[in-house]
């Protein structure tokens, strides 16, 4: 689960490397984000020629979490790292490439563009 101050890797080619969660969107009671949830984050580390510079506040969707979570069919899945993809104002990915696998739950949340860019969907 991703909560405030959780640091995540960035799984796209916007140039940002690490982001830190500031807030989880979806109501005042929502404290933790799962796969497919949108968060507000601050870019903590980026490459010099990045689209998302260090210190900027961005929206991102969580695509991988390390905590095992159950699927409706009874299976569990977990990933090796916490990762997110940076979004633009239209809730589409800002980058043009996605690195690493992403979870199938993004299809339910209508992030089909991320699924089509991803090399592997688990």
Swiss-Prot record:
Gene Ontology MF term list: large ribosomal subunit rRNA binding; structural constituent of ribosome
Keyword Ribonucleoprotein set for record: yes
PROSITE patterns linked to this entry: RIBOSOMAL_L14 (PS00049)
SUPFAM superfamilies associated with the record: Ribosomal protein L14 (SSF50193)
Any GO CC annotation of this UniProt entry: cytosolic large ribosomal subunit
Gene3D superfamilies listed in its UniProt record: Ribosomal protein L14 (2.40.150.20)
GO biological process, one term: translation
One Pfam family recorded for the sequence: Ribosomal_L14
Keywords: Ribonucleoprotein, Ribosomal protein, RNA-binding, rRNA-binding
SMART domains: Ribosomal_L14
Subunit structure: Part of the 50S ribosomal subunit. Forms a cluster with proteins L3 and L19. In the 70S ribosome, L14 and L19 interact and together make contacts with the 16S rRNA in bridges B5 and B8.
Family matches, as NCBIfam families: rplN_bact
Family indicated by similarity: Belongs to the universal ribosomal protein uL14 family.
HAMAP family per UniProt: Ribosomal_uL14
Described function: Binds to 23S rRNA. Forms part of two intersubunit bridges in the 70S ribosome.
Name used for this protein in its record: Large ribosomal subunit protein uL14
Gene: rplN
């Amino acid at each position: 689960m991703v909560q405030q101050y959780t640091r995540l890797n960035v799984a796209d080619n916007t140039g940002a490397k690490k982001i830190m969660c500031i807030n989880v969107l979806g109501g005042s009671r929502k404290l933790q984000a799962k796969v497919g949830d949108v968060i507000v984050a601050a870019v903590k580390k980026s490459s010099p020629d990045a689209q998302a510079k260090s210190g900027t506040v961005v929206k991102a969707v969580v695509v991988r979490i390390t905590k095992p979570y159950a699927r409706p069919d009874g299976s569990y899945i977990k990933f090796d790292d916490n990762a997110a993809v940076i979004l633009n104002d239209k809730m589409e990915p800002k980058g043009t490439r996605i690195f690493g696998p992403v979870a199938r739950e993004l299809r339910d949340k209508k992030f089909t563009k991320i699924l089509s860019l991803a090399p592997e969907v688990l």
